[in-house]
């Protein structure tokens, strides 16, 4: 066993780098004291959400309201002394300060009334901010303050009143803020600070893309968030492949986008040019019966003209047939995927107008395939090649899409472990006997955690491997497999029956059989075995998304004796009728783990104008027997290592092995 001095000597190179930040004993000792104090604070509040599916307005509201936490803080501070309507207005002001502030100011009859409202509002916001900042260090709060008004806000939040009257002190500062025309700015800054301090960490358990109108807005918000991680969903990885330039992934995301009449987002927000696709679609399919190709529509986003629906439907058909050709090519290149039964263009009997599905023959609903050569059904014609080339170029050159996908890679992974919670979107593939399913890729067998790690590594190849390399091609094909493959941990079903739903009338072929995991995760022993596979004790939790919980049918999101929580509650508007709710937020604070069930959100406009909030029901899952401190978290482990390193640095200074560059006791 090495002595302390031997360990310090071995770490001298690292300690010399650390000395750049702490150039003296005093500086290092001061940081040790601050860090050790931080360890004794309550752990920060973590929020978990999943399956956002582009529902930007509902997501923005839940983010702004901290899933109802901020309204709770408003009620705690103001209590019954302030009417319900006034508390609702104040909560809305915190959620949407830039939109709500002008409305509230207009109601003031004169300058005197406005000044009175300013004073009351600022004082109330200060009290709420003091409450949400109470479990943060002053240094942390100060770091969150805007430079333009940070000093004054720091004074208002941390003033002590042993030596002077609180009302007089606050009154003087607030009066000066109003007198100098800075009230609006301070109100907005306080609202933003309250939202910033209410939630420490945000975990998004997959599926940000598809179905909803504006995933780009969600990404822009997340990229500005102070601490977020993402566990990829199958709807995410296929967009990652599209951004990387994978033809099959590009066709797949466009097929989904057109199926939900959301191509406006692709064109206007990501700048993807669909003109060549539309021209080809009209050329080959413009006169077809497009009944089965009509998109899903949302009356809240209408109205839709016949011309709009036709344009969408004809492109939907064109991109689907192109996608089916490319699927066959990917399946041919990757026998490891074991998806040979999904090459449907080869399974069509062109004379009998039938198709073989799972060993049975079914009549086809649509037999118009003008771009398909029955002798070579997977070959692209010249027009399709041009369209595909233009689409790949457009996806690769979309600056915003590249930014969002790079963010997904930087902040995302197949799974994430933090503070005793295991997070993943889909499933840990299992057999019907309850063991981890084994799959072979590239000559090696993988199961359980090893399979998840392999999927993560190969998914990164698709974007980061050198252009034109076999590794990049392999990675892009695998991103498509993660979207729909039988043993994909992100999909977790036997097959994605897109072809059957479009072309086969018999609904028995539409079934997507869930992985046995979704039966076994009801067993506590199995959940504990999954946790053990990832190095976690049995008292930990699994946080899962992907499969909407049908609360309206009595299904519970709590599985496996409380070891697993499914947090896909149908956030997407398209699932509200199926689930009976509009999503969940799992909240893990220093005292409890609770699940908040959200009701549908009408609109941001109504939220601002009528103070409408998302109604949420809070269900306590676990209550801690003591308040969890930072030292008990993963962050605490990192901070303890930091203290250890700093103590070694102090000792290295004392031994003279590292020279102090600044001897300044003023840091004390």
Region spans (language model):
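Feature recognizes metal-dependent phosphohydrolase scaffolds
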Residues: 1-668
């Amino acid at each position: 066993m090495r002595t302390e001095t031997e360990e310090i000597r071995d770490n001298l190179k690292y300690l010399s780098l650390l000395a750049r930040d702490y150039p003296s004993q005093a500086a290092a000792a001061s940081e040790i004291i601050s860090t050790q104090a931080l360890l004794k604070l309550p752990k920060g509040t973590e929020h978990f959400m999943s399956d956002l599916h582009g529902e930007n307005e509902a997501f923005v509201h839940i983010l702004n309201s901290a899933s109802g936490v901020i309204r709770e803080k408003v009620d705690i501070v103001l209590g019954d002394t302030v009417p319900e309507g006034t508390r609702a207005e104040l909560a809305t002001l915190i959620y949407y300060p830039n939109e709500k502030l002008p409305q509230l100011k207009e109601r003031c009859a004169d300058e005197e009334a406005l000044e009175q409202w300013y004073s009351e509002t600022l004082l109330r916001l200060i009290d709420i901010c003091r409450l949400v900042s109470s479990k943060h260090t002053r240094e942390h709060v100060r770091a969150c303050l805007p430079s333009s008004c940070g000093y004054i806000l720091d004074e208002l939040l941390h003033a002590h009143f042993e030596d002077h009257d609180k009302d007089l002190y606050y009154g003087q500062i607030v009066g000066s803020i109003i007198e100098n025309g800075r009230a609006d700015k301070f109100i907005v800054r306080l609202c933003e600070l309250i939202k910033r301090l209410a939630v420490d960490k945000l975990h998004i358990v997959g599926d940000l893309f598809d179905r909803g109108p504006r995933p780009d807005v969600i990404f822009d918000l997340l990229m500005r968030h102070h601490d977020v991680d993402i566990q990829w969903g199958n709807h995410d990885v296929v967009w990652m492949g599209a951004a990387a330039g994978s033809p099959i992934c590009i066709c797949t995301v466009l097929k989904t986008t057109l199926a939900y009449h959301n191509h406006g987002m692709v064109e206007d927000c990501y700048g993807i040019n669909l003109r060549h696709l539309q021209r080809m679609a009209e050329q080959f399919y413009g006169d077809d019966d497009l009944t089965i190709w009509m998109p899903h529509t949302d009356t809240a986003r209408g109205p839709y003209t016949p011309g709009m629906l036709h344009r969408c439907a004809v492109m939907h058909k064109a991109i689907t047939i192109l996608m089916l050709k490319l699927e066959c090519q990917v399946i041919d290149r990757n026998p490891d995927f074991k998806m040979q039964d999904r090459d449907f263009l080869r399974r069509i009997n062109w004379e009998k107008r039938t198709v073989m599905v799972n060993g049975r023959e079914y009549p086809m609903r649509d037999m118009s395939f003008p771009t398909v050569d029955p002798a070579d059904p997977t070959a692209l014609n010249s027009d399709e090649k041009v369209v595909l080339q233009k689409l790949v170029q457009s996806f690769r050159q979309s600056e915003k899409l590249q930014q969002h996908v790079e963010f997904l890679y930087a902040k995302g992974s197949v799974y994430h472990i933090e503070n005793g919670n295991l997070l993943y979107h889909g499933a840990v593939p299992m057999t019907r006997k309850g063991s981890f399913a084994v799959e072979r890729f590239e000559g090696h067998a993988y199961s359980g955690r090893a399979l998840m790690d392999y999927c993560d590594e190969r998914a990164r190849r698709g974007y980061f491997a050198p252009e034109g390399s076999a590794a990049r091609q392999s990675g892009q094909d695998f991103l498509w497999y993660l979207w729909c493959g039988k043993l994909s941990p992100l999909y977790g079903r036997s097959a994605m029956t897109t072809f059957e739903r479009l072309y086969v009338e018999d609904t028995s072929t539409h079934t997507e059989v869930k992985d046995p995991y979704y039966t076994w995760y009801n067993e506590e022993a199995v959940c504990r075995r999954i946790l053990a596979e990832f190095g976690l004790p049995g008292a930990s939790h699994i946080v899962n998304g992907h499969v909407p919980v049908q609360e309206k049918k009595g299904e519970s999101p709590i599985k496996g004796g409380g070891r697993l929580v499914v947090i896909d509650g149908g956030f997407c508007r398209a699932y509200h009728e199926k689930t009976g709710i509009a999503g969940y937020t799992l909240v893990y604070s220093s005292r409890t783990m609770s699940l908040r069930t959200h009701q549908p959100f009408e609109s941001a406009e109504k939220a601002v104008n009528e103070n409408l909030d998302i109604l949420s029901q809070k269900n306590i899952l676990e209550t801690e027997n003591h308040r969890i401190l930072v030292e008990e978290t993963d962050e605490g482990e990192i901070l303890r290592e930091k203290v250890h390193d700093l103590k070694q640095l102090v000792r290295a200074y004392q031994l003279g092995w590292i020279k102090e560059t600044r001897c300044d006791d003023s840091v004390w």
